[in-house]
């Protein structure tokens, strides 16, 4: 991470501050060992995980007032994991996931910045058949549907990790694929309220 230009920022949720170390901008790139390339992450898409997107802010603001109780929560495609960091402040049972090889390092760094407990993290792709994440009561994510093939992959991943009464909260900026995802989830027995 030392070759990257970084940015530090604080996001406020009422009386709760979340401190973030992010990439300075969407032009950063550092993959000297080719780890991202081996996962199919191009240099153009490499920095997308490392900035806070508007959809992430919307999800975090929504989840800040959400009563998580004792629910086991999974954030998929966490990127900078703003919602996971906020839920961690609330002492929620959160696991964050992302496909990007650097996301876990930034999550660890940001959890320390916020003086919180370590956050469970798994580097996993939606097509990965062998993960041991288990089942969750609440699955959250934002701005996930970049490409057409993501619809089926995401739907199958959510179905594979959902308890029978699982709630799914996804924020989409209008990339044109949310209706297809909703249709797939309805086929799995979910209800859609979008």
Regions found by a protein language model. Give the residues of each.
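S-adenosylmethionine-dependent methyltransferases
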Residues: 1-194
């Amino acid at each position: 991470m030392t070759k990257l230009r970084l940015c530090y920022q604080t996001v406020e949720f009422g009386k709760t501050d979340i401190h973030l170390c992010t990439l300075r901008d969407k032009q950063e790139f550092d993959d000297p060992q080719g780890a991202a390339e081996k996962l199919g992450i191009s240099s153009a898409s490499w920095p997308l995980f490392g900035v806070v997107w508007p959809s992430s802010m919307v999800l975090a603001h929504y989840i800040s007032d959400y009563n998580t109780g004792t629910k086991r929560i999974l954030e998929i495609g966490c990127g900078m994991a703003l919602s996971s960091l906020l839920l961690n402040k609330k002492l929620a049972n959160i696991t964050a996931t992302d496909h990007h090889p650097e996301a876990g390092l930034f999550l660890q760094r940001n959890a320390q910045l916020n003086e919180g407990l370590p956050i469970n993290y798994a580097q996993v792709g939606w097509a990965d058949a062998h993960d041991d994440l288990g089942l969750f009561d609440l699955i959250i994510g934002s701005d996930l549907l970049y490409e057409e093939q993501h619809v089926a992959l995401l739907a199958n991943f959510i179905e594979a990790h959902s308890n029978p009464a699982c709630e799914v909260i996804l924020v989409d900026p209008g990339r044109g694929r949310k209706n297809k995802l909703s249709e797939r989830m309805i086929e799995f027995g979910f209800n859609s309220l979008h």
